[in-house]
Amino acid sequence: MFMLPGCIDSGNEADSIFHGELITSGKSISEFTLLTSENTTYDFKQNTEGKVTVIAFLFTNCYDICPVVTYNLRHIHESLNETMLDKIEFITITVDPWRDNTTILEEWKQSTKSYWTHLTVADTQPSSQDMATLTQVWNDFDVGFKIEENTTESNTSARHHPSSYDYN
């Protein structure tokens, strides 16, 4: 026996009524430019205008939810045809730019087969324009995290605050 609940239309219009929260307007996001894992600049507005945009905030040293999120995004990404991929922009933005430089992000991208844009910054000094930009991105998307001092290289403690965002 093979069952596909919810996947077959009953033909009854009453069964097709939308259940959920209708999103009528998106969140306003500041324009920004960050650095890709290929060490090129990425203009958010230019690359996402007119597209559905899927953004994940994560870090490569995470052994908790980040690989799961990446796997799920990869599954979705791989299920889309070229026409759909032209209308959807997938982006990963690091929350650990001190560790996730372009080389590390590119290694992560290749090892996880997450073949979409991964973003970081070059200058992680607190007073740098790069960090000001990245901090503004985190603030715009209400990304919450806590920086904790590591006592060992293997310390992967992190606080994740998953949420979803609608961008216009």
Where is each model-derived feature located?
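Sec/Tat-exported extracytoplasmic proteins
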Residues: K51, L58-F59, C66, H77-M84, ...
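Extracytoplasmic
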Residues: K27-I29, E49-V52, L85-F90, R159-H161
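Secretory targeting signatures
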Residues: M1-A14
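Structural microenvironment flanking redox-active thiols in thiol-disulfide oxidoreductases
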Residues: T70-V137
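Thiol/disulfide oxidoreductase modules built on the thioredoxin-like
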Residues: P126-N168
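N-terminal "domain-start" segment that seeds a small globular fold
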Residues: N12-Q46, Y71
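Short active-site neighborhood of thiol/selenol oxidoreductases, capturing the structured segment around
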Residues: D43-L73, F90-I91
